């Protein structure tokens, strides 16, 4: 399908480039991703250009840039975060390191009466999502300030005559109130007609699969039972016919309680017939004494390939005629450093070196790799899956192994004193640094830092959100904040690192806790109100062999940003009572961290 009116998104390697494209598509305009090194003739083909965010600083040597000739094309241009700063620098403005940085929610304030078409239907006070360590301190000639935030003097700027705009916040994420309104305003400025929808993606993707996969080739599809792999499997079956796609499920020993049997029943109902292999002993053996999150993910990814190879041999399949199918979605690739300028936040199990080599050899097919979770769900419904099915909580491909933390990381006395000093101004709140670390993301870069636990004086959620956001923004050694529900005095508790083995005993413990939590939220009718709720096992207790559980309920749409779910106290209390009935569980924590700075999963 030839589309003459479209918007280019120039990728500078941030987490958000493809998300921008996705959001524009959902607003009914077609988008394509371009590199920042395209010839000027390529940029000239578009009705509008968006310069994405990125993990670099525009003043760093060799940081990615773009030709200044794009500003002479007469095409509307929107810069977002890094893209905004790059426009300012290239046209004569000044960008410097910010004094504090800005991560998470901020309030957008309009500047005087400088109304502008890019902010049509904005009234001021809208929440926007920030994720930056640099800021613009001087505008180029011809630009004016349109809006600002508490910590950002130039949150929105414009050169109205040239239709060039810059915004410091991320309008493309769901947590920016009216973000879609701003993007739709830009679409209107570009004069782009509504030419895109998920139904068109389906038609184009089926055609692409049929043209890409040779007639003699078949697909070996790794199905976890999650939404992504299931939708991928159905899409491949629709494009190629079910006889050319083999669904294969590996029981790793790190699946949820009764998952394999449940999945077989549910997928059979959808006419999906799986071959199941129990490889739990191999996974337990290979992960013994392992703790580093990157190493764990890479081991899991390689074990999946080993299991696949054995299955190919045992099933007497012609290896050369088979492609590996994966349910990879875009956040998996971008968090694994999947674009030229991106930083690795975490290596996903389907992006380990062995699989990367297969991808380079053309032996992997990933039919939904450019989609986000919300789009995958829409596609699933279009393919005939029930809404209840596609609405299930996301579950990581490696399973519970990424929800079992094993790395000890003690905070320093100096760090604790800094935390104490800040919290002393917060009306009775106190905190302790837990001796563990988790993966997070700050300014599009991976962070691996400590977690702080706060006491509970039944402070309202908004105040806890503010304090948690401030802690993770202000202190570089913190990227996650949790609450110890219904416990006002932390001094009486001794949070010791007790160690963790990725074995059947610990996975059974987490399986039981996970099942307990899900049972409560389903009983109370909350399951569909929470986007995802990882239940995490921590090696924290007072005695040897004791562990702790973290509740991580979040609200999100696309997994690129998220905020913690404000749970009713009565619900939290019921969950705590039920979970602490499990003998080995000593503490129950509640995660107060937004994304950024913390990833949804702890590893």
Curated annotation (Swiss-Prot):
Pathway: Purine metabolism; GMP biosynthesis; GMP from XMP (L-Gln route): step 1/1
One Pfam family in the UniProt entry: GATase
InterPro entries according to UniProt: Class_I_gatase-like, GATASE, GMP_synth_C, GMP_synth_GATase, GMPS_ATP_PPase_dom, NAD/GMP_synthase, Rossmann-like_a/b/a_fold
Annotated catalytic residues: 81, 170, 172
Keyword list, A-Z: ATP-binding, Glutamine amidotransferase, GMP biosynthesis, Ligase, Nucleotide-binding, Purine biosynthesis
Record function comment: Catalyzes the synthesis of GMP from XMP.
Protein name, UniProt field: Probable GMP synthase [glutamine-hydrolyzing]
Organism: Leptospira interrogans serogroup Icterohaemorrhagiae serovar Lai (strain 56601)
